[in-house]
Amino acid sequence: MSKKYIIGIDGGSQSTKVVMYDLEGNVVCEGKGLLQPMHTPDADTAEHPDDDLWASLCFAGHDLMSQFAGNKEDIVGIGLGSIRCCRALLKADGTPAAPLISWQDARVTRPYEHTNPDVAYVTSFSGYLTHRLTGEFKDNIANYFGQWPVDYKSWAWSEDAAVMDKFNIPRHMLFDVQMPGTVLGHITPQAALATHFPAGLPVVCTTSDKPVEALGAGLLDDETAVISLGTYIALMMNGKALPKDPVAYWPIMSSIPQTLLYEGYGIRKGMWTVSWLRDMLGESLIQDARAQDLSPEDLLNKKASCVPPGCNGLMTVLDWLTNPWEPYKRGIMIGFDSSMDYAWIYRSILESVALTLKNNYDNMCNEMNHFAKHVIITGGGSNSDLFMQIFADVFNLPARRNAINGCASLGAAINTAVGLGLYPDYATAVDNMVRVKDIFIPIESNAKRYDAMNKGIFKDLTKHTDVILKKSYEVMHGELGNVDSIQSWSNA
């Protein structure tokens, strides 16, 4: 029997990645299509220009298939994963009626407002891509996180008229929805021509980008926390029943049908802040790295490894993109002295990511009355040994890195493998397709320093800075009482 292959699509904020796997979870080839910079005319607007989402998928698909030297008939399916908390407003024919709305746009924190008569459907990014790939008006229910009329008990659209009225999207404007691991449709000849994916290939549901990443990381037990390092940095653990009015976390649908994850508060513009610093350093960093035969990222990690844990008190508040209900918050770096250079800033950002997530994790676990025994770190940031050690030290737990750290596409492949019957269940698929690369053990002296730095210092920093930021916001923008936004776990 010939070897079989699965394609996993990972739609993100800055690019679309398409990866082909064999059934043992090995990467065969991969393609990538960059997204254009978002249209951000003001602090509340973030839109994808043109038909950028589809164009990036087509580019990534062509890139992938141009590298594949095998028999296309051995490719058995495609798992579609795309970013959550976004909106696609479509005409009756499924084409965009307006620019696609990013999760960074303030409008997605509020119920839909029907102001454009051309809009026939309101859907997620995965819904839009499903239609472009298959011609179907279908989507996976698990990508409807936020301002959508979802019944979390039935995993379906709500049948409660009051709920439908609250979110202001009539049923006829919503796509039909189905469970993760089910077939949405098949690649049309037109989509095959545009993407170079084989026509007729089944397209399988996953969920939203973060839960499918948790599946690709191998999150199946109750003793593990997953930290997903992306533009938005997420914190997830396995869930049981729907919680009643949680404060420090919220339930989300996982990539396994009828199974929940619990998600703690994350960091908006998380790894973006690392890229921001790298790009600000510009040509100087590139030239320094080239002289040492290193990438810019490797040079940053090399130099930051020489900075003492705790950065001598240099701390970063990671509020480069705030929640709409807290518009006064701003990114802050505090604690400089004249001896510090960019390596200190870089390490401070890494440490502050870990410390922020540790505090959010503690709040979540204290409320659940359950703590993890180890953490899995996913995303490109986990390539840094320094960052991995910082996570181990700050959490004072073993921090694991997998052989495949871009786990969203692998999770999509796992959904496809189970959905098409190539594995009998998710436990078997994960056991065969997910492999641990290495584990970082906490260094006791570092863990003690981070704990002392956090308690009463970093943990309470924004209690002091928020007072000043609120005053400066009102000088620049007027009274905070005029802010029109909604706060709840369903749109955090």
Swiss-Prot record:
InterPro entries: ATPase_NBD, Carb_kinase_FGGY, FGGY_C, FGGY_Carb_Kinase, FGGY_N. The keyword Transferase applies. The gene is ygcE. Its EC number is 2.7.1.-. GO terms for molecular function: kinase activity. GO terms for biological process: carbohydrate metabolic process. CDD domains: ASKHA_NBD_FGGY_YgcE-like (cd07779). The lineage of its organism: Bacteria, Pseudomonadati, Pseudomonadota, Gammaproteobacteria, Enterobacterales. It comes from Escherichia coli (strain K12). This is Uncharacterized sugar kinase YgcE. Keywords: Kinase, Transferase. It is an enzyme of class 2 (transferase).
